[in-house]
């Protein structure tokens, strides 16, 4: 009896069918700089160097983490791709880079073209929101490697910034103002803790009055906000001195990454409203306050540091983009050594 690749668990025909299903989603994301079509060995992108004096390429890679477990349980797969793009492009945008193109890696134990197409539909939507092109990716069918119906995602984004316009935090000074920009919810961090706190007690279809009648699945799968275009628009109007994308490690772990040594950011938690989902996690899981702040974004997905004289202009620019933002603290002199961030009551 002859043995085929399909007998071993890899269905080439299903993979080809997936490629056909995702092309209509990926094609609208392509920018004029993209050369060739979808499905080649490598994605080609002709950088328009005339737009820059000293072009610097910026790259970022990330995943979605155990938020995917919620998607599996809810059988919703069309938004985690947005999360994937957000986690990558937000990281490169905070240094001032315009996201140019994106590639994804989708791995599963048993390929379903329909499920994979839903995932890539979300990735394409994330690319649309970020203004970058989905120029390639990899689909891996790995029999026996994942539970049935499960998959993992990884993304890779490349952008470009003019060297004189890199935002690296070196100009941050004592007295500068810290502005927090609203998150859409948990984003894509802390889901192992959130799932333990909530899903060990409630089903995904449980509706909390505090969530406005939304189900837990709705709240937990709310896509990560993509700030890339907002960051670039703000930089056109205000000389922002530093940005921080608030991901794993929360405010205390991420704000110092963009501050000079010998400084500290002091944030006052009463200055911004905290979305209800964080209160639910804290209460239902009896999670200590410090653990909440070092795990979750706590309602601020992006932080900007500006000079006091630019505070009003920054708020006006963010309002014009439809973003909620608050002055949440200031930069102070710190002790010797690395920068720190403290959230005070």
Swiss-Prot record:
Organism field: Anaeromyxobacter sp. (strain K)
Pathway participation: Purine metabolism; IMP biosynthesis via de novo pathway; 5-amino-1-(5-phospho-D-ribosyl)imidazole from N(2)-formyl-N(1)-(5-phospho-D-ribosyl)glycinamide: step 2/2
Lineage per the UniProt record: Bacteria, Pseudomonadati, Myxococcota, Myxococcia, Myxococcales
Catalytic activity: 2-formamido-N(1)-(5-O-phospho-beta-D-ribosyl)acetamidine + ATP = 5-amino-1-(5-phospho-beta-D-ribosyl)imidazole + ADP + phosphate + H(+)
PANTHER family in UniProt: TRIFUNCTIONAL PURINE BIOSYNTHETIC PROTEIN ADENOSINE-3, TRIFUNCTIONAL PURINE BIOSYNTHETIC PROTEIN ADENOSINE-3-RELATED
Any GO BP: 'de novo' IMP biosynthetic process
Gene Ontology MF terms: ATP binding; phosphoribosylamine-glycine ligase activity; phosphoribosylformylglycinamidine cyclo-ligase activity
GO CC terms, sorted: cytosol
Lineage top rank: taxon: Bacteria
Protein name: Phosphoribosylformylglycinamidine cyclo-ligase
UniProt xrefs under CDD domains: PurM
Enzyme Commission no: 6.3.3.1
Protein localization: Cytoplasm
Gene that this polypeptide is encoded by: purM
Family recorded in the similarity comment: Belongs to the AIR synthase family.
Coiled-coil residues: none
One Pfam family cited in the UniProt record for this chain: AIRS
Keywords assigned by UniProt, alphabetized: ATP-binding, Cytoplasm, Ligase, Nucleotide-binding, Purine biosynthesis
